[in-house]
Amino acid sequence: SVIQQDIDGGIQNYKGMGFDVAIMASSIQCLRRPRNAMRNILQVANECVITLPNFGNWELRLGLLKGKMPSSAQLPAKWYETKNLHLCTIADFEGLCAEESFNIKKKVYLNTRGSSSWLANTFPNLFAAEAVYLIG
């Protein structure tokens, strides 16, 4: 089943339903309360796949050094048109998972071409453009 709901508003309608997997694709950074959303989703699903852009990527950092809000192929919107509320890096997200005791079962770091690479895997906070997590 596919269910779409405003997760910022809560997911009370689905408590106790016991989904196997929930997917939050490139949306965690758009939520008002991402920590609460992750807590709530893991109450109704055994696992959650979360994908997020890495705002610590070197290309975005370079944009900031130039004095402008950065954009990239993964984040093409201008600062005044973006839905992103919480800009986080891979290190920030993994820190939140540790803080909340969310078990990261698997993680994949993707470069700007959308593939895994030695640089993205070795220095993900600097060279990964996006990350994919399986948490439970």
Q: Each predicted region: which residue ranges?
A:
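Short, well-ordered beta-strand core segments
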Residues: 2, 22, 47-49
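A short SAM/SAH-binding and catalytic strip from SAM-dependent methyltransferases
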Residues: 20-34, 52
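A short acidic, Gly/Pro-enriched loop at the edge of an enzyme's catalytic core
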Residues: 12-21
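Conserved SAM-binding strand-loop segment of SAM-dependent methyltransferases
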Residues: 1-13
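S-adenosyl-L-methionine-dependent methyltransferase catalytic module, highlighting the catalytic core
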Residues: 35-43, 47-136
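Short beta->alpha connector loops
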Residues: 8-9, 28-33, 113-116
